[in-house]
Amino acid sequence: MSKRIYNFNPGPAALPLSVLEEIQATFLDFAGTGMSITEVSHRSKPFDAIINDAVTRVKRLLGIGDDFKVLFVQGGASMQFAMVPMNLLPDGKSADYVNTGTWSTKAIKETKILGKTVNVAASSEDRNFAYIPKELSLDPNAAYVHITSNNTIKGTQWADFPDTKGVPIVSDMSSDILSRPLDMSKFGLIYAGAQKNIGPAGVCMVIVKNDLLEKANTGLPSMLAYKTYADSNSLYNTPPCFTIYAIDLVLKWLEETIGGLEKMDAVNREKAALLYDLFDASSFYNGTADADSRSLMNVTFRLPSEDLEKRFVEEATKNDLGGLKGHRSVGGCRASIYNAMSMEGIQALVDFMKEFERTNG
C-alpha cells in the first residue's frame, strides 16, 4: 500500500481505513454481480439490500423506530437550508433559529429568501461566534427550532441541546452526526451532509419524524419534498449509489468495530482532550472557542503570528499531517478530528505540536 497521511481536513474528510480497504476489494465485483458498485442499477436487489441495511443501521445506532424515516437526499446540507422551511414552515407561522456561525447564518438567509418569518432566538455573533448561547428567546408557537449542532469554522459545539418545551428541534449535524448518543425525542428532523463524518461527498442524510412528514407543506416540486423521498425509499430518481454504499460500510464499522455511539463518544472525548489539554498548558497555542463550547470534532487554534501559522501548516504537511489550515474566512489553524481519525493520528499531531513549540516558541 502506498503511504497514507493523517488527514485532518474538514470535509471531504478521513474515512476508516478498513472501509476504504473493503471498497477497494469489492470495487470491480460488487456482491458477486461482476460489476462495480458504480455500475449497478439503483433498482437492483443488491443495491436495494445496501440502502435498506443503511437505514436499519442508522435507526439501530440512534435507537429509533418506525416513527422516523431515514432519507438520502442530494444537494448537500446547503439544499436543506431551503428544504427545511419549504417543507416544515407553514405560511403564517415563524421558526426559531439560533445563529452560531457561518452555516446557521446561511440557513437563516435561505429561509428569508423564501419569504418565511424567522425569529433569531439567540446569536453568538457579538463575540465572533466563539461560544454557544445559553439564553434563548424561544417562541412557544414556533414551527421548529433550528440549531447547527457543531460549528466547523469556529470550533464550537452544543454539549447539551436546549429544552424547547415540545417544539421540535431541527438540527444541521453535518459535522457531528453519529459521533455521540442523542435523545431523539427532542428532534423533529436532523440533516447531515455525508462528507465529514459518515462517508464521501454526494448525499445528505435526513432523519425526519413521521408526524412532521404528515403535516409537511404540499405543492412543492417533487425533488424538494421530503414526502417524495419517504414514499420511494430515496429511489425516486437515481441516487449516488457509491456514496450510499460507502456510508453503509461506515455504519457497519461504527456498530461492529467501534461498538456503538457511547463508545464512539468516549473515544472522541479522549481524542479532543489530548489537544485541548495541550492548549491549556501552553501560551503558544490558543484555542479560539470558549472552554465550555469547545467542539469535539473541529479543534480551532491560533499561534502567536500568521507567519508562524503558515510555517506550522507547511511543516506539519511535510510530517504527513494534512489539512491543518484554518477556514479561509477566519485564518488560523484547525484540526478536524471526526470519528475516523485514529488516536495514533492525534498523538502524532500532539507530538509534532510540542516539538514545533519547542523550536519556535
From Swiss-Prot:
What does the note under cofactor report?
Binds 1 pyridoxal phosphate per subunit.
Gene Ontology CC entries for this record: cytoplasm
Q: Which residues cross the membrane?
A: none
Cofactors required = pyridoxal 5'-phosphate
Print the keywords alphabetically.
Amino-acid biosynthesis, Aminotransferase, Cytoplasm, Pyridoxal phosphate, Pyridoxine biosynthesis, Serine biosynthesis, Transferase
Compartments where found: Cytoplasm
Q: What positions belong to coiled-coil segments?
A: none
- Record's family? Belongs to the class-V pyridoxal-phosphate-dependent aminotransferase family. SerC subfamily.
Q: What does this protein do?
A: Catalyzes the reversible conversion of 3-phosphohydroxypyruvate to phosphoserine and of 3-hydroxy-2-oxo-4-phosphonooxybutanoate to phosphohydroxythreonine.
- Give the protein name, as stated in the record: Phosphoserine aminotransferase
Question: Which source organism?
Answer: Desulfosudis oleivorans (strain DSM 6200 / JCM 39069 / Hxd3) (Desulfococcus oleovorans)
Q: Which gene encodes it?
A: serC
